Amino acid sequence: MFVASKQADEQKKLVIEQEVQKRQFKKIEELKADMQKGVNPFFKVLFDGGNRLFGFPETFIYSSIFILFVTIVLSVILFQAYEPVLIVAIVIVLVALGFKKDYRLYQRMERAMKFKKPFLFKGVKNKAFMSIFSMKPSKEMANDIHLNPNREDRLVSAANSYLANNYECFLDDGVILTNNYSLLGTIKLGGIDFLTTSKKDLIELHASIYSVFRNFVTPEFKFYFHTVKKKIVIDETNRDYSLIFSNDFMRAYNEKQKRESFYDISFYLTIEQDLLDTLNEPVMNKKHFADNNFEEFQRIIRAKLENFKDRIELIEELLSKYHPIRLKEYTKDGVIYSKQCEFYNFLVGMNEAPFICNRKDLYLKEKMHGGVKEVYFANKHGKILNDDLSEKYFSAIEISEYAPKSQSDLFDKINALDSEFIFMHAYSPKNSQVLKDKLAFTSRRIIISGGSKEQGMTLGCLSELVGNGDITLGSYGNSLVLFADSFEKMKQSVKECVSSLNAKGFLANAATFSMENYFFAKHCSFITLPFIFDVTSNNFADFIAMRAMSFDGNQENNAWGNSVMTLKSEINSPFYLNFHMPTDFGSASAGHTLILGSTGSGKTVFMSMTLNAMGQFVHNFPANVSKDKQKLTMVYMDKDYGAYGNIVAMGGEYVKIELGTDTGLNPFAWAACVQKTNATMEQKQTAISVVKELVKNLATKSDEKDENGNSISFSLADSNTLAAAVTNLITGDMNLDYPITQLINAFGKDHNDPNGLVARLAPFCKSTNGEFQWLFDNKATDRLDFSKTIIGVDGSSFLDNNDVSPFICFYLFARIQEAMDGRRFVLDIDEAWKYLGDPKVAYFVRDMLKTARKRNAIVRLATQSITDLLACPIADTIREQCPTKIFLRNDGGNLSDYQRLANVTEKEFEIITKGLDRKILYKQDGSPSVIASFNLRGIPKEYLKILSTDTVFVKEIDKIIQNHSIIDKYQALRQMYQQIKEY
């Protein structure tokens, strides 16, 4: 019976063990599945219950027992006094309750005391890093921050303990040796456009960060990652836009942008290799540096240096998609500077300044003060006094509790804060043996402290993942320091930051007791961090996810010079809008742009706004551009008068072509004019060819056409006769009033032939009172004048009339192409599908799109309906020839249409249909897409009315144009809108 009972117990234990293994296996699979999705658990067992003895820090238990024992000996045995024992016991209980509430309290107190009372911690007393950190109480400053005059000794101590890594000297280009015998190198990394990139692609990109820290499992390496958000001022108020309204509008816009809060967000990864604790080699210690055998020492250093550089190159390769740039030396005006030291200097007080590199300098630390004169600490805030006597306020944020799981979007809200900050994450990997010891130690502590089975299972899962190489572990700490120009702004920033962190599942608050620790730890230092705990390599990778904006355009040195204008991205960084592809100033670059936006999305406002901004390109040409080409012409092909007021206010001519009214167009007169200019023979022949083609199109208007729009029944003989007559009329020295009439008169013998040339051209002739006589049979002065800077042409009346629209459009585009002669040229075509409806016109524009870049011209095609544009005969050419696409909101869009015309991703389409309110989605070939705002709030409302003309104001604008006594049409428009009661 005993044997049977024993077997039953063993069987029961086996079943339980199998069940535990199943549960553990299931949990591991769940964890792996989450990790594949970019969701990584925090193993709090490593820094919560597992690191405590009976729920309290082990050292606290031992020190409390010792203090209580000493108190009893001194008070009870020697003096028979029980009160001290009671007091000490109460203090211990109160502190214990504090530890129960916040298990980090003990470590924070211990590390903070290194600043408060450093004489108790001899191990951290180093040579003073910066003498500038001194406390000088000031009544004036006390008005802003309640300073504690008794903290001077603490601050001096803090300076003494500022950094474990005091910079000693340059060891190589981009490598600095510290006085703790470690090497430092820093890489600047670009962000990922997380708002416009699909979740799947983000996970794949983020996996490259995971791989970096799985490759480093030795404690000789430490990593310091800095997210730096710096306020910048966008000042473009000195730009000259040449046109009166353009100057007024853009001045108002640029002044508004100058007042806006713009930030530059950057990411830096600093790698530290400790030369004293190198594994797998004879340990090198400080006595090597006191040896007389310097050659051997230098050989070791060189070997370590090469190894260090190889590791940095490996990291750069693994993070290649983040566009890594090593911070090295650079030369300016014959002087060598160090980008690396400039960055370390910047971390002191967020002051930017050049740093001259001297390889022989052995006392870098004496120069690395960051332009800071004094630092003052109060309870929750501090103040920096710079060398130039400017002031900056700061506050540190302490994160007490972390969310249960980490993801790459953990700190997105922090990156979007309306505040300057430096967010430092420090990570030191553990080697395999240390990991095993750590897990075994934690396992014992769980048992001793009465931990739960869940904790044990979690630890088992962690051991399995570490053993399989899925993750590694390391020590981690962080320092988040906010900066502001005023105390009120500082308080507001702290409030927003704490609120943002708490919303993500953290427990955060403004640091008080440990503020000095956080302030000094933001450099590259573990020693001053108030709290260090263990996290997985994936957790750390999530903390440092570089989610920002990798493409911000170019502010300067573009094809035509400066950027068109500055917009604001979703993370409050500047986006420098350009239509040209990135290139050097003066280079021929593709700038054709497709603009898509539904009714009410702000398409007309955006086009008019940017048209005004491009007025600046009338100035500043490369030296190799001839004088006659140093000009700018902008042509706006309008519909429904949307740009009417804007063109007039800019001082341009607005050509309205009305059905049945003489257009003022005379192609013959234009071609004859070209013959008398200094145009090349090719240009002269082209002008004649255009008129020949146009007249042939008129003559074959009613004929049946093939797929290319050519007449099937028009004979070659008639074609040759017509061509010869057109050439004679243009090249002959005669009056070209009513050229169609003159052409018909030349074909007198054809009068009675219903299919003859006379009959074919009669509808366009005044002498025969033709239906379309108003088109081209006009006086000998052509209305179109492309010598002006801005011209508008409205197609509202004729675009829907298929009888005349193809001819007008053909002639307009032919004239425009002739004007693209090497000058800077902008052609805007609103509702482009209407202008390109005829195949012959479409193919003509197709050829123009292919050659315009070489002519220094850009074409911007816009439409409300992407479906209509897809029906255009040259839709494929538009997609290929327009490297820049700009999308405004379209709630009713179709994904397949957007993919076909503009290669839009599902994520981008989701943004277009849901996320664009007075914003654009900018997409340029070879660059990530960007969401940017063109918010015009604060701009005078009469300016906004001018940018986009409502049809109810068309007649009022007509009156202003027709009233020749009104000299300044722009001011008349302003007054008209200002007088409207709504404004």
Curated annotation (Swiss-Prot):
GO CC annotations, alphabetized: plasma membrane
Cell location: Cell inner membrane
Pfam families: CagE_TrbE_VirB (PF03135), P-loop_TraG (PF19044)
Chief place of localization: membrane
Keywords attached to this entry: ATP-binding, Cell inner membrane, Cell membrane, Membrane, Nucleotide-binding, Translocase, Virulence
NCBIfam families assigned to the protein according to its UniProt record, in alphabetical order: VirB4_CagE
Quaternary data: Component of the Cag type IV secretion system, which is composed of a wheel-shaped outer membrane complex (OMC) and an inner membrane complex (IMC). Interacts with CagV and CagBeta.
Function of the molecule: ATPase component of the type IV secretion system Cag (Cag-T4SS). Acts as a molecular motor to provide the energy that is required for the export of proteins. Required for CagA translocation and induction of IL-8 in host gastric epithelial cells. Plays a key role in Cag-T4SS pilus biogenesis, especially in the localization and stabilization of the pilus-associated components CagI, CagL and the surface protein CagH. Is also critical for assembly of the entire cytoplasmic portion of the Cag inner membrane complex (IMC).
Family that this chain belongs to: Belongs to the TrbE/VirB4 family.
Designated name of the protein: Type IV secretion system protein CagE
Lineage of origin: Bacteria, Pseudomonadati, Campylobacterota, Epsilonproteobacteria, Campylobacterales
